[in-house]
Each structure stands twice: as structure tokens, then as C-alpha cells.
Design a protein with these regions (language model features):
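Short, flexible loop/turn elements at secondary-structure junctions
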Residues: 20, 80, 146-148, 158, ...
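Short, surface-exposed beta-strand-loop junctions and turns on beta-sheet-rich folds
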Residues: 22-24, 82-84, 159-161, 169, ...
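Short hydrophobic/aromatic-rich beta-strand segments that constitute the beta-sheet cores
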Residues: 76-78, 163, 287-290
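Proteins synthesized as precursors that undergo proteolytic processing into mature forms
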Residues: 94-130, 243, 247-257
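Aromatic- and glycine-enriched pocket-lining scaffold segments that form the walls
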Residues: 118-154
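A contiguous strand-loop segment
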Residues: 1-95, 128, 318, 322-330
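C-terminus-biased signal that marks the final domain/tail of proteins
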Residues: 1-15, 129-131, 137-138, 147-149, ...
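A residue-level signal for conserved active-site and pocket-lining positions in enzyme catalytic cores
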Residues: 73, 117, 278
Length: 330
């Protein structure tokens, strides 16, 4: 149910990557919410954004963002947190009452950094709203980073916003973040370097290839396995000063947790798979998206023109498979 990470490159670019793993046909699209945009929460609260932002979202009883970045370089991705998130059931006086899915609008539309978000958090109250399209109140938490590379988890307890620093910069799903950090202790032996030979009863035991240092790295698609795998790979992926290669490396990291159709089949739903991958450059305020069934990357940069429009802009990019043919006999 989604993997997110944040990485800072050698040339001081901050990138947030995420997979959107789900079993409902989202048909997600890149979109822009401009500065000073008037909006109405499903709780009845009305507001006006202070900052413009771009992201990827879907029309689900109103447009819902799954991720995005604002003009100050604050970025976010939405992820499930079943069994741990708890929302309010009624409105709270003297608070901004919004739904669990509208956290993206608050964070991107009203905050300039994680520190700013922390200062505003006490003014927010999250009210549970049932979504008919998916048949539940989605239990959510959020991976949030700012232009400095600082990352946090945003979750909810009885509707109150809970912010936890996340220096490893990886977020998946349940259990809670403390559990995931503790679980990493089981994998401190995993290394990108080859294991050394060992002498056993006078016999030299050689490692099985250069990859032997990674033996024991989890390979499944549970949230616990994805967390460990992403934490290891993010920490060790080779970096250089090539901005385009940094972008490709971020997508390669996402490929390591990408779920093809047919690999995860819930009893009560269709195939659960990675519907799209997104890499967000917080430094340049650019959104890169790659959809399932396409090998193309579509890019959307947050420009002054988009920020200053009156209404939302939703893009519907075509999805293509591009193959470069080296001869004509194909």
C-alpha cells in the first residue's frame, strides 16, 4: 500500500519518490492548485490556499491529491496506515476541520516548511469522512519533506495531528514507525560489499558471488519488507553530479518495490499493484510521473503561470510504450 522515500543528492537536489499501490482504478492525473484558490472541505469548512502546488490525484467524490509539492518545496505522499490512524467523529470548535484526504491541501496550500507545519498543526482537526468509491474511511498517514531534506511522518490520533521526525526518510505502512526502526536492527549485517571467506573446520567457505553481502535482504511486498529494502537501497545507491541520472536513480529505487499486476491478489478486491510512480524534485518544484503500462516519464513544473491561474488545472497525459527500433524488420 505505497512506499515513499526522500533522498538528497550530491548536487543538493532533494527528491521525494513514491509508489501508488492500490486495488481501485484511480485513473490519477497531474494537477495544479493555484495560489489563493477558494475551496470547500467535505466537512463544510471553507478556505483559500496561500500557496500554489502541483501533484497527482484522482476524482473521487471531488479531486483528491495523493502527492505533490508546493511553491516553497514542501512535498508529501499519502499512504495507508490501517489499524493505527484515528480521526475525529465531530467538528472541533476553533479549529480548521478537514477530512483525512484534505491533509495534502492543508500542508501544501498553507505551509512553507516542516517547522511551519509543526507550528500550525494544533489548529487542524481531522474528521473521518467515508468515501463511497472505495467503501471505507481510508486510514492514512503521510510522508512529508521540505526543501532542506528534513522528513517527517504525519499521522492522526483522535483527529489530532501527530508529527514524528523520520531521519531515515522512508515510509511504508503499518506497523508504526518506531516498529520499523526497531526492525532494522535485524538487518544491520546486510552490506553492498561481498561477504568475506570463512574458515570452517579447516575448510575455506567462499561467499556465493559479489552479491553475498545482500543475503537476507527481504524481497516480498509487505510493508515491513519494503521498508527494509528501501532503507538499505536508498542509503547505498551510487550518486554522482548528473541531475538526470539522479532522477533515474530515484525511479530505479521505486522499481525495487514496484508491484506488477498479478503478484498481490486480495480476496475482496481486484489486483493490488503499483498504478504509478512519482518522483518529485523539491528543489526545482517539478513532478515526474510514470504510469503502469508505460515506460515514459511525464514532467510538470510548478511555474508562475500555473501558480497564478484562477482555477485548478488537470492534465490528462497519454500513456505510451516507447521502443526504439534499430531495424525495419519488426
Amino acid at each position: 500500500m505505497c512506499t515513499g522515500f526522500t533522498i538528497q543528492t550530491l548536487n543538493n537536489q532533494v527528491l521525494l519518490g513514491r509508489t501508488m499501490d492500490y486495488d481501485y482504478p484511480l485513473d490519477s492525473s497531474p494537477a495544479v492548485t493555484p495560489r489563493n484558490y477558494r475551496w470547500t472541505s467535505r466537512t463544510g469548512t471553507t478556505g483559500q490556499t496561500q500557496y500554489g502546488f502541483i501533484g497527482t490525484g484522482t476524482d473521487m467524490e471531488g479531486f483528491i491529491y495523493g502527492d505533490g509539492v508546493n511553491e516553497h518545496g514542501v512535498a508529501i505522499s499519502t499512504q495507508y496506515f490501517r489499524g493505527y490512524s484515528s480521526y475525529g467523529s465531530t467538528h472541533k470548535a476553533d479549529a480548521m476541520n478537514i477530512t483525512q484526504n484534505e491533509i495534502v491541501t492543508w500542508i501544501l496550500g498553507y505551509t512553507t516548511s516542516i517547522e511551519d507545519m509543526k507550528q500550525q498543526a494544533s489548529q487542524i482537526h481531522v474528521v473521518a469522512v467515508y468515501l463511497n468509491d472505495i467503501g471505507e474511511v481510508p486510514p492514512l498517514h503521510y510522508h512529508v519533506s521540505d526543501a532542506t531534506g528534513h522528513s517527517v511522518e504525519v499521522s492522526f490520533k483522535e483527529g489530532e495531528v501527530v508529527i514524528k521526525d523520520n531521519p531515515i526518510g522512508v515510509l511504508t505502512n503499518h506497523p508504526d514507525l518506531n516498529w520499523h526502526y526497531s526492525n532494522l536492527r535485524q538487518y544491520i549485517n546486510i552490506s553492498p560489499y561481498p561477504a568475506t571467506a570463512n574458515l570452517l573446520e579447516g575448510v575455506t567457505i567462499e561467499p556465493l558471488g559479489n552479491e553475498a553481502g545482500t543475503f537476507g535482504l527481504p524481497g516480498g511486498f509487505t510493508s515491513t519488507e519494503r521498508f527494509v529494502r528501501m532503507a538499505f537501497m536508498k542509503a547505498n545507491i551510487a550518486q554522482n553530479n548528473d541531475k538526470e541520472m539522479d532522477l533515474m536513480n530515484a525511479f530505479y529505487l521505486l522499481d525495487a518495490v514496484n508491484i506488477p499486476i498479478g503478484i498481490v491478489r486480495p480476496h475482496d478486491a481486484d489486483n493490488h499493484y503499483t498504478m504509478y510512480q512519482t518522483v518529485i524534485n523539491l528543489t526545482t518544484r517539478t513532478l515526474y510521473t510514470k504510469y503502469y503500462g508505460s515506460n515514459e516519464i511525464v514532467a510538470l513544473k510548478l511555474t508562475d503561470d500555473l501558480i497564478n491561474r484562477k482555477d485548478m488545472t488537470i492534465f490528462k497525459p497519454e500513456k505510451h510504450i516507447t521502443i526504439r527500433k534499430l531495424n525495419d524488420n519488426q
